[in-house]
């Protein structure tokens, strides 16, 4: 799940 999409979600948080 993505927390706030940093750029393009580097390592899928």
Swiss-Prot record:
It comes from Lacticaseibacillus rhamnosus. Antibacterial activity against the Gram-positive bacterium M.lysodeikticus. It may act as a pore-forming protein, creating a channel in the cell membrane. The keyword Transmembrane helix does not apply. It comes from the Bacteria. This is Bacteriocin rhamnosin A. Keywords: Antibiotic, Antimicrobial, Bacteriocin, Secreted. Its main location: secreted. GO terms for cellular component: extracellular region. It is found in: Secreted. GO terms for biological process: cytolysis by host of symbiont cells; defense response to Gram-positive bacterium.
């Amino acid at each position: 799940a993505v927390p706030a999409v940093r750029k393009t979600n580097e390592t899928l948080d």
